[in-house]
C-alpha cells in the first residue's frame, strides 16, 4: 500500500496507480511505463529496496488456460461418478437397516436381566381401593393418617367406631403438674444405672 501511495505522489495524479510488481522492478536503467496513453520515465528510487521475483513471461498465461481446461475435463469426468455414489450409499443404508433390525432381538437376548430390576408394579403401592360395598364418602377423612389394614375384620371394626376423632396424647409426668417442686421432678427423671465394677484393674 505504501508503494502505491508513493507512485501516486510521483506521477502527480491521484487517479493513476501502478501495480506493486511493476513498481518494484530492479535495475539501474530507467524504465518507460505507459499510463493513461502517455509515456513517462520513472527513475530508480533510492532507499529501501525489496527483492521482488522477476516478472513471469506471458507464456505462463497460456499454461493457466490449459490448467483450466484440464480442471473442466476432470469436473466432467467426476460428474458420472457422483451419480453412482448415491446408489452405492443407498445400498449401504439398506444393509445397515437390515443389520440393525437383525441386531434388535440379539440385544434383548444379551440383556435379559434388565427386566428383573423392577419385579413389582409401582402403581400397586399408589392405589388403595376399597370394595364397592364399603362407602366412605360420608366420613370426614380430612387430616386422618393413612391406615393399611391387613384383615377385613379390622376394617369392619373401623366402620363400627364411627367418624374418627383426634386422640389426646398422654402428657409427660413433668408437665402434669407445674406446681411440683424441682426435687420431685428430678425424682421422676432418675434412672437406675447398673452397679460399677471395681474388680477391673486399670
Curated annotation (Swiss-Prot):
GO terms for biological process: cell division; chromosome organization; DNA repair; homologous chromosome segregation. The modification N-acetylalanine is found at residue 2. A motif (TEK-box 1) lies at residues 71-73. Belongs to the securin family. It is found in: Cytoplasm; Nucleus. Residues 35-94 are annotated as: Disordered. The N-terminal destruction box (D-box) acts as a recognition signal for degradation via the ubiquitin-proteasome pathway. The TEK-boxes are required for 'Lys-11'-linked ubiquitination and facilitate the transfer of the first ubiquitin and ubiquitin chain nucleation. TEK-boxes may direct a catalytically competent orientation of the UBE2C/UBCH10-ubiquitin thioester with the acceptor lysine residue. GO terms for cellular component: cytoplasm; nucleus. This is Securin. Interacts with RPS10 and DNAJA1. Interacts with the caspase-like ESPL1, and prevents its protease activity probably by covering its active site. Interacts with TP53 and blocks its activity probably by blocking its binding to DNA. Interacts with the Ku 70 kDa subunit of ds-DNA kinase. Interacts with PTTG1IP. A motif (SH3-binding) lies at residues 163-173. A motif (D-box) lies at residues 61-64. A motif (TEK-box 2) lies at residues 94-96. It comes from the Eukaryota. Keywords: Acetylation, Cell cycle, Cell division, Chromosome partition, Cytoplasm, DNA damage, DNA repair, Mitosis, Nucleus, Phosphoprotein, Proto-oncogene, Repeat, SH3-binding, Ubl conjugation. InterPro entries: Securin_separation_inhibitor. The modification Phosphoserine is found at residue 165. Pfam families: Securin. GO terms for molecular function: SH3 domain binding. Regulatory protein, which plays a central role in chromosome stability, in the p53/TP53 pathway, and DNA repair. Probably acts by blocking the action of key proteins. During the mitosis, it blocks Separase/ESPL1 function, preventing the proteolysis of the cohesin complex and the subsequent segregation of the chromosomes. At the onset of anaphase, it is ubiquitinated, conducting to its destruction and to the liberation of ESPL1. Its function is however not limited to a blocking activity, since it is required to activate ESPL1. Phosphorylated at Ser-165 by CDK1 during mitosis. Phosphorylated in vitro by ds-DNA kinase.
